[in-house]
Amino acid sequence: QPNEISDALDVRSRDTVEMLAKVLPSLTFAYDGKIAYLTITNDLYDKDVQTDSFVSYPRYIEGVDVAIMFKAVEPAVTRVSMRSKSVDVSAVAVAFGGGGHLRAAGCTIYAPVEEARTQLLEALGKLV
């Protein structure tokens, strides 16, 4: 049925949308707006809420080349998802022990989210 396909692609749970509303205020820009990122802090993190699509939201912003989502899954463990229009984010992910594709990659950084963010942005800053 067409509506089932549409629902599978477009419909989000209420929990996911409520989480997005909490995370969007964290939107931050770096490197003259070429990088935009969202952060899910430890107090917001809920393993039962689907947040994988959140990394796409910063990509919709004019001038943004690299979109990142930092997810603090434990006090000293940060999961990172990256999407890019032209930067090889897989090279950055591999440098942090992760992997992926040229334009979509991720890694886990064993550091608090603030420290992980600083490390990753420094590495990406050399590429944008």
Region spans (language model):
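Hydrophobic helix-and-loop "lid/oligomerization" segment in the mid-to-C-terminal part
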Residues: 1-96, 100-128
